[in-house]
A protein has these predicted regions:
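Substrate-binding pocket helix/loop in short-chain dehydrogenase/reductase
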Residues: 97-98, 102-107
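Active-site loop immediately N-terminal to the catalytic Tyr-X3-Lys motif
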Residues: 99, 146-153
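Conserved glycine-rich cofactor-binding loop
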Residues: 8, 15-16
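Active-site helix of classical SDR
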Residues: 121, 157
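The beta1-alpha1 cofactor-binding region of Rossmann-like NAD(H)/NADP(H)-dependent oxidoreductases
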Residues: 40-41, 60-71, 103
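SDR active-site lid
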Residues: 174-243
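Residue(s) in the substrate-gating loop at a strand-loop-helix junction
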Residues: 141
Length: 274
């Protein structure tokens, strides 16, 4: 990984899941790192797990706070002097159908999942443009390709990330900054367990969602991170992670108005007890 090994990478949401796996693989490849997460304990665990003789800085950060992201970018540049890769990975989930969640719930998720990405690009782009080669990776989701029941806020945020990233790629085409949008399929992380329960969603929604998530997550965070870094080295504009994501992408293209009929049974069927 020639590009990655010679650079300075910023990874948000690095306290667990894909973000932690990315930090570990980047450090092992020789990349300097600035890792951030709102979870201070998780961030410390990630930092302690990193291997490699590389410069590392840790930053407790709420990506929904614009002023905090601006200060974060300034701090990273002051410490590392340059940035070549930014991975906007931080994200949260919300359980409940649209009528079961409050507008405050909806805004909370959008502020993290969408505006956190926008802020990350806005305040790191100037330093990225100063490098001979640089890369922005924005993490969307397979739910930025299709829109399942019970994911109104999450899908809205991930479709927004997808659209924003595609526009950004077109606007930066021909420059030194390449842009990739990542669409992970089912990844084994703690996002479902940590999801916020909608204001009016029944308590059983969490148990059902976690059981469904466990059944539909064939890919590991480590596999996801490796695929993302492969896509960065290859300068891929769209990075689909997992066979499930590739299948859903094809299905949506073939049946854009009726794909949910094909997906609903698989996604919504109850977990079978042994």
């Amino acid at each position: 990984m020639v590009f990655v090994a010679s650079g300075v990478a910023v990874v948000t949401g690095a306290g667990s899941g894909i973000g932690r796996a990315l930090a570990q693989q980047l450090a092992a490849a020789g990349s300097a790192l600035a890792i951030a997460d709102v979870d201070e304990a998780g961030l410390a665990e990630t930092a302690a797990s990193l291997r490699g003789n590389v410069e590392i800085s840790t930053h407790v950060l709420d990506v929904s706070d614009e002023a905090a992201v601006r200060a974060f970018a300034d701090d990273v540049v002051a410490r590392h002097r340059r940035v070549t890769l930014v991975v906007n990975n931080a994200g949260v989930a919300l359980l409940g159908q649209f009528e079961e969640i409050s507008l405050d719930d909806f805004r909370w998720l959008m502020n993290i999942n969408f505006w956190g990405v926008v802020y990350g690009v806005k305040y790191f782009l100037p330093v990225l443009k100063q490098q001979p080669r640089a890369h922005i990776v924005n993490v969307s989701s397979v739910f930025g390709l299709v829109a399942p029941v019970g994911q109104s806020a999450y899908s809205a945020s991930k479709f927004a990330v997808r659209g924003f990233t595609e526009v950004l790629r077109h606007e930066l085409e021909g420059s030194n900054v390449f842009v990739s949008c990542v669409h992970p399929g089912g990844i084994r992380t703690a996002i479902a367990q940590r999801a916020r329960l909608g204001a009016n969603a029944p308590a059983r929604s969490r148990e059902e969602a976690v059981a469904r998530f466990d059944r539909l997550t064939p890919n590991s965070a480590e596999e996801a991170a490796a695929r993302i870094l492969q896509g960065v080295e290859r300068r891929e504009p769209r990075i689909l992670i997992g066979r499930d994501a590739r299948q859903i992408d094809v299905l949506q293209r073939l049946r854009p108005a009726t794909y949910w009929k094909a997906l609903a049974k698989r996604v919504q069927e109850p977990t079978r007890k042994p």
